[in-house]
Amino acid sequence: MKISDLESFEPFLPQGAVVMISSKQHQLKALYRRFEHCQNCSLGTQRQNLVFGEGNPESKVIFIGEGPGEEEDLQGRPFVGRAGKLLDRMLAAIGLDRSDIYIANTVKCRPPNNRVPAPEELNACSPLLQEQISIIEPKFLFTLGKTATHSLLPLQDPISQMRGNWYDYPPIPEIKLLPSFHPAYLLRNPSAKKAAWHDLQLLAAELGNPQKKPSHL
């Protein structure tokens, strides 16, 4: 398959990826087409791009963040700013890169001034995220920060208490969910990186990935 054949799949493939198109990719493409002009909440009228998500649809794990920032909105890709660079280092520390995982957010359009998504915005995007999870059928969800964690679990405890513990994902209990800190939080609070490294080790152990202690996250 030629690279040109994959151009319409760019919203959910890693940048530069050349792979055979699977059934899951076809389903994700159809899902993207359903929502690409979504205006189910006010965020849809203000965005530059819908940040659908990207990565390996055959992945065992989905990393789920809060929502797009300025750079993500401009490029239409998740985690491409400073927090994204830190996420790349976090993945590398457990032997992964973006081609090994899938990355999504709880909301697909940028909230103004990068504020926390409002409940009605989370509710509007929830069906899309739920369908992404159902299509990919991961074994694990790694939630980054309180917004992603609280939106997927019927719990509202502080992320500092929830991180590092495994939970059943309520719609599909066979999928296990592990909360951790959002990379943007780690940039503001470097002292939390030790706890985040512990969380990554828990995930790596379940994935069977080699772990190497990073010189820094």
Region locations from a protein language model:
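A polyanion-binding, active-site-adjacent surface
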Residues: M1-L217
